[in-house]
Amino acid sequence: MQNRLPTTYRIASVKKETADVQTFTFEVSLGARPGQFGMIWLPGVDEVPMSIAYDDGKQLKITFFAVGDMTKELAKKKEGDLVGLRGPFGTNYEWKKGQKLALLAGGYGAAPMYFTAHEAIKDNCDVHVFVGARSKDHLLYIDELGSLKGVTLHVATDDGSEGYKGYNVNQLSEMIEGGESFDEFLACGPEMMLKAVSGISSDKKIPSQLSLERYMKCGYGLCGNCVVDPLGIRLCIDGPVINNDICVQITDFGKYHRDDVGRK
């Protein structure tokens, strides 16, 4: 059930994932599906959208990178502190029972991809997860993904410090050229990674679902800050998960974002 108004919840636990990435666990459920996001609120600071890393009906997790003013303040919070949450918002990843899926995760996109893999294997899907990061020290959710039965984990790092040396999209492409096949791609990560996944999807005629990120304020489609050109899609309600046949029509996909007042 969607919680449309900010409600404060206590942080049940804090996990330090990397030097700049943390995971908060809350003893609450928003009824979220993989790919959806919530609005995270700190009174007197700001409210920002974040992908939901896990929601099993009892616990909810968010994983975030402390990069801006809001997330740096959030990173100071400890177990027992209060944080405002509302949601879930947006579209989610979808699949059919028994499909062979390639899940591509770049950076902290590994968090929602773990949630996706966790749910997809319940439908007897053959799940391959391609996790990419700059280096071994930046990899996320490797242990969690590796522990899921029914998941084949592929790791890629830009510097070759762990797994395949290069981009996870290149790793996927090489496997496909070698004869591997998939029914669908699901991806979350930096937009240039998504652009590359989109290209393979179009070339090989394999459907894909991509999670696009834009500046979001309301979550209701009212403010228009997350609108993408030229279709007028509001990513907070028509996305963030978009099918590739729609993505290829978006002129700013892989090119530019609008800022907090809508400027290119």
Locate predicted features.
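Local cysteine-cluster metal-coordination motifs and their immediate loop/turn environment
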Residues: 191-192, 213-240
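FNR/FR-type flavoprotein reductase catalytic core
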Residues: 69-215
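A generic structural signal for residues embedded in beta-strands
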Residues: 40, 84-85, 228
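Short, Lys/Arg- and Gly-enriched loop/turn segments at beta-strand edges
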Residues: 46-53, 90-99, 236
